[in-house]
């Protein structure tokens, strides 16, 4: 495998370094002091969109080939694929502040599930606005509940069929960016006794009756990132908003879709951890050097 960073990705990394010094790190410090997320109307998000961030992997009904193109010049570095470039950029953003990094506009954690599970109409309706992003917009994902965290098979939010609609009843917590999102991909169960087999995912739009009581969670860290709890009080969702349609779940595929979403993000989480670790090391060394640390050679010589 070729680990060389192509010129385009390197240029984006360098631009992020400048953005990190000017905006990302200061916004993270400000959020820590104020104890609240960076507001969605902040000019930083406009700037980020202007740099091309927040767009979806979905290419529209016609689609496009996103595989790296071979260069005619054998000595020229090939442009790396989107996944590898995303890892490097996520690492760089998290170096400056992970809370600000994960607050970035975009379709959110549910993007992968919509692409892999959604109908063509659902992909077009919910992801096409993110193809050519002209302003900051967000999508969100809601799986976690007060009594169901990593054990996603234990979710209790109910989905009850009512004619052509579904009625959602339950509570969600730690849903990233959900109060500012155009839609939330909400996971619920048609029957808790079915365990994983009862899972269903619904595209719940902002403003739907019964989607209410948004509350930003208080956390020890990631203050710039909006982690939200909310309630579904008999929230009525059209049948067409069931992700993938009813036939998709006949093979107990709901849980597989949820896990595919999480699995797709694991490399990004690892990249972010590397960025945070690099930042912690650099800050620690800078502090030790500036304070001389009794001229300890273990610090002085590094």
Label for each model-derived stretch:
Residues 148, 173-179, 222, 265-269:
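Glycine-rich phosphate/pyrophosphate-binding beta-alpha loops
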Residues 2-12, 213-302:
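Glycine-rich beta->alpha junctions and the first turn(s) of the following alpha-helix
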Residues 20, 89, 119, 141, ...:
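Buried hydrophobic positions in well-ordered alpha/beta secondary-structure cores of metabolic enzymes
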Residues 98-121, 149:
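N-terminal glycine-rich flavin-associated loop
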Residues 151-169:
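Cytochrome P450 C-terminal beta-domain/meander region
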Residues 1-104, 125, 129, 161:
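Amphipathic, small/basic residue-rich leader segments at the start of a protein or domain
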Residues 169-213:
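A short core secondary-structure module
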């Amino acid at each position: 495998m070729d680990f060389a960073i192509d010129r385009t990705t390197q240029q984006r990394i360098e631009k992020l370094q400048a953005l990190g010094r000017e905006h990302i790190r200061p916004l993270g410090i400000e959020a820590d002091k104020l104890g609240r997320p960076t507001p969605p109307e902040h000019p930083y998000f406009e700037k980020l969109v202007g740099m091309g961030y927040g767009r979806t992997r979905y290419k529209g009904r016609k689609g496009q080939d996103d595989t790296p193109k071979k260069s005619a010049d054998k000595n020229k570095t090939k442009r790396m694929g989107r996944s590898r470039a995303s890892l490097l950029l996520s690492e760089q953003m998290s170096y400056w502040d992970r809370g600000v990094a994960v607050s970035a506009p975009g379709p959110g954690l549910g993007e992968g599930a919509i692409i892999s599970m959604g109908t063509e109409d659902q992909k077009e309706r919910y992801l096409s606005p993110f193809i050519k992003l002209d302003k900051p917009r967000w999508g969100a994902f809601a799986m976690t509940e007060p009594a169901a965290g990593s054990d996603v098979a234990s979710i209790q939010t109910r989905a009850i069929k009512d004619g052509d609609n579904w009625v959602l009843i339950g509570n969600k917590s730690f849903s990233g960016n959900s109060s500012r999102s155009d839609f939330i991909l909400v996971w619920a169960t048609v029957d808790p006794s079915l365990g994983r087999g009862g899972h269903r995912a619904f595209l719940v739009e902002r403003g739907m009756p019964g989607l209410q009581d948004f509350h930003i969670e208080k956390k020890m860290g990631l203050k710039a990132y909006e982690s939200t709890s909310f309630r579904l009080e008999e929230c009525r969702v059209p049948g067409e908003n069931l992700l993938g349609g009813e036939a998709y779940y006949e093979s107990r595929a709901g849980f597989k879709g949820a896990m595919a979403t999480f699995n797709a993000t694991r490399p990004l989480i690892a990249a972010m951890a590397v960025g945070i670790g690099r930042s912690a090391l650099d800050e620690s060394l800078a502090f030790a050097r500036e304070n001389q640390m009794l001229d300890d050679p273990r610090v002085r010589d590094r």
